[in-house]
Structures are given as C-alpha cells and as structure tokens.
C-alpha cells in the first residue's frame, strides 16, 4: 500500500499530508530511494512531503 501512496503522491493525485500514519515511514523510504534513483529530485521530495531530505 505504501507503494501506491508513493506513486499517487509523485503523480500529484494525492497529498502526503493525507497519507495514513501507518504508511508514512514506508512512503518516505520509497521516495528517498526515488531521489537516489533519479526518479524525483531532492526539491521535489521536499515539496511533495514537506520533509527535509
């Protein structure tokens, strides 16, 4: 389910703030990996999550 949330957040169809608490840590981990893999930038990560990279 965390992967679905990550995909929707990155696609702009959902907001991280609406992500259920039980998935947030996993979503952040997946999104940090996406930064490392070049899928999104650090700025996009911070903008999408409101969290510092």
What are the residue ranges of the model-derived segments?
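Viral virion structural and adsorption modules
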Residues: 1-53
């Amino acid at each position: 389910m965390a992967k679905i949330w990550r995909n929707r957040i990155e696609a702009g169809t959902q907001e991280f703030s609406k992500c259920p608490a039980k998935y947030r840590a996993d979503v952040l981990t997946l999104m940090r990996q996406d930064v490392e893999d070049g899928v999104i930038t650090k700025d996009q990560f911070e903008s999408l999550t409101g969290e510092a990279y």
